[in-house]
């Protein structure tokens, strides 16, 4: 009897690592699935007309100190040009977003099991922040030339750089905001990862609502 119990116990112990490995694999797969779902949803929402311009949460506005200059321009009959500049900034961001898809997917696929386990029990946007750390710079390099192409079509773009450069010299705006292309690229990235984070939070809070058995299994018990 004791021998039988010993054999049974040994068998159960042998199965434990397998169960743990399966659980870890599910965890990593769940994180990947959540990121992919969030990335696709965010890119779909932002990478279309008015994706940025029509959403107050991600709409790209002029930097704080330049808003006063914009009001002055509007008072002197240049309001239409200011509006054209802001619209161009947002259209540039909308045009750039589709370029992020391939990099986002590649980053998701490269996530290790250990990475998944570390962020599974993190905050509502912990996966997105890990993701952002891995992809923000390369996505920015993809965005920049598209933004440059769009802003060149606007007459106020050069004037923005001149005025913003002076404002940065006086410490009125951040140095990185003094170039319109860099500014729009940065804000476009901020908006993209904000939307991905919101999608991740939704999945964590309501995994059943995703319709995915895997996401329900991984996030349902958190």
Where are these regions (language model features)?
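N-terminal export signals
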Residues: 3-21
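N-terminal Sec/ER secretory leader and immediately downstream segment
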Residues: 22-88, 93
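Short N-proximal segments of mature Sec-exported proteins
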Residues: 28, 32-36, 40-41, 125-128, ...
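Hydrophobic alpha-helical segments involved in membrane association or supramolecular assembly
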Residues: 33-44, 83, 98, 102, ...
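Residue-level signature of catalytic and energy-coupling elements of molecular machines
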Residues: 42, 112, 207
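Mid-length scaffold segments of soluble, non-membrane domains
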Residues: 83-150
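An amphipathic alpha-helical core segment
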Residues: 146-192
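A cross-kingdom marker for long, charged
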Residues: 191-222
């Amino acid at each position: 009897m004791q021998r039988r119990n010993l054999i049974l116990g040994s068998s159960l112990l042998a199965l434990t690592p397998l169960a743990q490995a399966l659980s870890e694999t599910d965890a990593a797969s769940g994180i990947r699935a959540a990121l992919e779902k969030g990335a696709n949803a965010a890119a779909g929402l932002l990478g279309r007309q008015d994706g940025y311009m029509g959403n107050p949460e991600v709409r790209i506005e002029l930097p704080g100190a330049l808003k006063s200059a914009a009001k002055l321009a509007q008072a002197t009959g240049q309001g239409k040009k200011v509006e054209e500049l802001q619209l161009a900034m947002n259209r540039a961001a909308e045009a750039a977003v589709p370029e992020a898809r391939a990099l986002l997917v590649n980053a998701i696929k490269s996530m290790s099991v250990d990475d998944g386990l570390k962020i599974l029990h993190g905050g509502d946007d912990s996966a997105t922040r890990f993701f952002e750390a891995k992809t923000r710079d390369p996505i920015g390099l993809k965005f920049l030339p598209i933004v440059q192409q769009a802003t060149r079509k606007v007459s106020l773009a050069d004037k923005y750089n001149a005025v913003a450069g002076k404002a940065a010299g006086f410490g009125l705006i951040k140095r990185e905001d003094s170039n319109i292309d860099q500014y729009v690229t940065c804000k476009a990235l901020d908006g993209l990862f904000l939307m991905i984070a919101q999608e991740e939070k939704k999945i964590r809070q309501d995994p059943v609502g995703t319709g995915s058995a895997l996401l329900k299994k991984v996030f349902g018990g958190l």
